[in-house]
Amino acid sequence: MELSVFNIKGEDTGRKVTLNDAIFGIEPNDHAIYLDVKQYLANQRQGTHKSKERSEVSGSTRKLIRQKGGGGARRGDINSPVLVGGGRVFGPKPRDYEFKLNKKVKSLARKSALSYKAKNNAIVVVEDFTMEAPKTKEFITIAKNLKVADKKLLMVLPEKNNLVYLSARNLEKASVITASELNTYAVLNAVNLVLTESSVAVVEQNFKA
């Protein structure tokens, strides 16, 4: 698949980039995508949730009413889960949500996500650029020139560039990552994928198998 390379003014440079069909042109595997996104989101969880159970609630252990003869239901102490202020039954406890996923499944998922973008003509290639200073206004202008400003976009750089990153950080609909940070969730969470000319080669090198 060949794509035209644009400059930051949105003009066609006349150069072409050929995307590797083994990465951008495979038959997408939805189940692999599901597993990779599930793992990514699970790994983001802190898992620090905690609620007190019956034995942890502060309160008297005195039996509220006698066992028999009162005419009502049996009742223990004030920490009972059926009473307001009592402990919670089977409440959440701190835990680690991370789980293992095979490298081949991850690779297949990311190739599938990239293939979906290529299939939907949602990939734009821009020549390598940098900025003199972090300017959000300039980043918006570049996005408008490339006709990707209206919807969520993900820009992939070959390596870290703080000037570009800081320029986009304050934008709700824009994200900037490096090619080595590329993941299935980030690709699918964006409507348009903007690759710099050099990042295409880095992405293909990372997924070469």
From Swiss-Prot:
Q: Which NCBIfam families match?
A: rplD_bact
Q: Name one GO biological process term.
A: translation
Matching PANTHER family, A to Z?
50S RIBOSOMAL PROTEIN L4 (PTHR10746), LARGE RIBOSOMAL SUBUNIT PROTEIN UL4M (PTHR10746:SF6)
What Gene Ontology cellular-component terms does the record carry? ribonucleoprotein complex; ribosome
What is the name attached to this protein's record? Large ribosomal subunit protein uL4
Coiled-coil ranges per UniProt: none
> What species is this protein from?
Parabacteroides distasonis (strain ATCC 8503 / DSM 20701 / CIP 104284 / JCM 5825 / NCTC 11152)
Q: How does it assemble?
A: Part of the 50S ribosomal subunit.
Gene responsible for this protein: rplD
Q: Which family does it belong to?
A: Belongs to the universal ribosomal protein uL4 family.
Identify the taxonomic lineage of the organism of origin: Bacteria, Pseudomonadati, Bacteroidota, Bacteroidia, Bacteroidales
Query: Which cysteines form disulfides?
Result: none
- UniProt function note: One of the primary rRNA binding proteins, this protein initially binds near the 5'-end of the 23S rRNA. It is important during the early stages of 50S assembly. It makes multiple contacts with different domains of the 23S rRNA in the assembled 50S subunit and ribosome. Forms part of the polypeptide exit tunnel.
Give the signal peptide as a residue range, or say none if absent.
none
Question: Residue ranges of region Disordered?
Answer: 44-77
Q: Which UniProt keywords apply?
A: Ribonucleoprotein, Ribosomal protein, RNA-binding, rRNA-binding
List GO molecular-function terms, semicolon-separated.
rRNA binding; structural constituent of ribosome
Q: Name one Pfam family in it.
A: Ribosomal_L4
